[in-house]
Amino acid sequence: MRGKRIFIGSSSEELRLAEQAKKILEKNTNYQVTIWNENMWDKAVFRLNNSYLNDLIRATLHFDFGILIGTKDDKVIFRGSEEIQPRDNVLFELGLFIGRLGLNNCAFLVDEEIKILSDVKGISLARFKEKDSDSFNNAVLSIRESFDRQNDSDINFFPSSTLAAVYYENFIKPTCSHIINNGGLLDKNGYIYKKCTIKIIIPKKLTSDVNSQFQRIKAKIETKELSFEYLGRPRNINVEIIAEDGEVMIIDFPTILSGINYAISNLLPQDFNSMSVDYEAILSRELERFVYTLKKIALRDGFDDLIKIVDEDN
């Protein structure tokens, strides 16, 4: 599994804090941290000739976690008194990342003297004292610890996670339940294959036509069809199998993956180039999320020993 990616946003005036936070987050970890202003070709968040909002929307699909740094940038009049608050764009970015990544995967690293609006309360807040390095470092470490706890437990609401859950509930779970309840795979003729495995084949990359992609993979494998009763429903499940010496391997190609391409294309701005490196990177990331979510749900239900997820070359 690739390293988790973290986005750090701040005002231009407080880039030094973002850089300090990056060093702490990356020290002895597998996190890949990108600050909003980094302009290396493979890490740039805001690019020339691109709109600010489009770049932000793209960024929310690239990262696993978001940290926004709130410092004493602007004075505002609040109910007749003067207050200090972060830049409006920092608050906007915080809301955008929370909306995409969820509350547990975002944090607001904020100066303790800043007034926090009631709408912001309830998210992960890490307070620090201005010009106090220890205070700032401890606040960043608390965020890192919070993100560490998410690494092995999060199943989020990205398109891939939703599709993996649907695929699991409609195929993997009833198939595994049938195998367990019947002591194996019971075909419509009454024969039981006692040793069963579900082999889920995942393409290396997603194309615009996933169905044709799977047909090409399927053509390389000699299988036969088998039908068995769908647990709890008045219909059968038809599967492709490889049977040998009383053992059976169910071969499945999750064509539901085509929904990732469709969902991502609708989440991104209309003028986003679907042939770009960025788009391919987002698709690849969603493919990883699909596999990750599928494994986590199977492990949760105790079916992980019945499934094997492989890429198309295995």
UniProtKB/Swiss-Prot annotation:
Residues 5-129 form the TIR domain. NAD(+) hydrolase activity is strongly stimulated by c-di-GMP, weakly by 3'3'-cGAMP, very weakly by c-di-AMP but not at all by 2'3'-cGAMP. Self-association of TIR domains is required for NADase activity. It catalyses: NAD(+) + H2O = ADP-D-ribose + nicotinamide + H(+). Keywords: Antiviral defense, Hydrolase, Nucleotide-binding. One of its GO terms (molecular function) is NADP+ nucleosidase activity. Pfam families: CAP12-PCTIR_TIR, prok_STING. Homodimer. Forms homodimers; in the presence of c-di-GMP forms filaments with an ordered array of parallel-stacked subunits. In the C-terminal section; belongs to the bacterial STING family. This is CD-NTase-associated protein 12. It is an enzyme of class 3 (hydrolase). Effector protein of a CBASS antiviral system with NAD(+) hydrolase activity. CBASS (cyclic oligonucleotide-based antiphage signaling system) provides immunity against bacteriophage. The CD-NTase protein synthesizes cyclic nucleotides in response to infection; these serve as specific second messenger signals. The signals activate a diverse range of effectors, leading to bacterial cell death and thus abortive phage infection. A type I-(GG) CBASS system. Its EC number is 3.2.2.5.
